[in-house]
């Protein structure tokens, strides 16, 4: 007896996420076709499960190849899309917390950590309001977590102790060194 299965009645399997190598190929193509040769970029593993993410520098930093600001691009559903940006007063650096990598920038009283979760920017913004309970004028800004630009958690104002606890829960790995968008540099992707 010959038996045929109708594939229309089979359950759909999970759609496979893009591999790191296919993401890097997409970033290489995007850099070649859509980004000026005068721009600087870096690919860092801050995406979903530390998958590759493309950063394009926007504000030059304080050393060769360093930037204090960047746009963040992510490959999802067959396209490279801008998902966010990060900019502040310090050179962008790579940090880690609970196995997830983040990029960071900040000032003496603020620390911004960004990664990509579920294909969206995930920003943890911490601000030091010092002794705001004693001196209400010392309120700086509310500490929040944003996903895709929307606040998903509001911590309110943090005093120095709370701010330092939050900030120090991330571990420094390295400064992010951007490279010029040249054919030679893209070959190394």
Language-model features, listed with the residues they occupy:
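Repeated scaffold domains used in trafficking and secretory/extracellular systems
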Residues: 38-40, 88-97, 109-112
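Acidic, small-residue rich beta-repeat scaffolds with periodic aromatic anchors
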Residues: 7, 18-20, 25, 29-35, ...
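Acidic/hydrophobic-patterned starts of short beta strands in beta-sheet-rich repeat architectures
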Residues: 47-58, 98-103, 122-124
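Beta-propeller blade repeat segments, especially FG-GAP/WD-type strand-to-loop junctions
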Residues: 67-84, 113-118, 146
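Short, solvent-exposed loop/turn segments at conserved positions within beta-propeller repeat blades
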Residues: 63-68, 135-136
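Beta-propeller fold detector
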Residues: 81-87, 153-157
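Sec-dependent N-terminal signal peptides of Gram-positive bacterial secreted proteins and lipoproteins
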Residues: 1-12
């Amino acid at each position: 007896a010959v038996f045929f299965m109708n594939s229309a009645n089979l359950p759909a399997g999970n759609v496979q996420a893009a591999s790191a190598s296919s993401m890097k190929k997409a970033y290489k193509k995007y850099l070649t076709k859509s980004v000026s040769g005068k721009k600087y970029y870096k690919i860092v593993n801050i995406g979903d499960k530390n998958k590759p993410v493309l950063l394009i520098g926007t504000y030059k930093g304080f050393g060769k190849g360093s930037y204090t600001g960047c746009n963040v691009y992510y490959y999802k559903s067959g396209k490279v899309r801008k998902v966010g940006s990060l900019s502040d007063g310090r050179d962008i650096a790579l940090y880690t917390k609970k196995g997830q990598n983040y990029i960071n920038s900040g000032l003496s009283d603020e620390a911004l950590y960004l990664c990509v979760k579920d294909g969206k920017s995930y920003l943890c913004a911490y601000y030091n309001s010092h002794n705001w309970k004693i001196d209400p004028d010392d309120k700086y800004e509310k500490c929040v977590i944003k996903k895709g630009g929307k606040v998903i958690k509001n911590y309110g104002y943090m005093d120095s102790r709370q701010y330092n606890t939050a900030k120090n829960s991330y571990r420094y790995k390295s400064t992010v060194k951007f490279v010029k968008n040249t054919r030679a540099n893209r070959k190394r992707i």
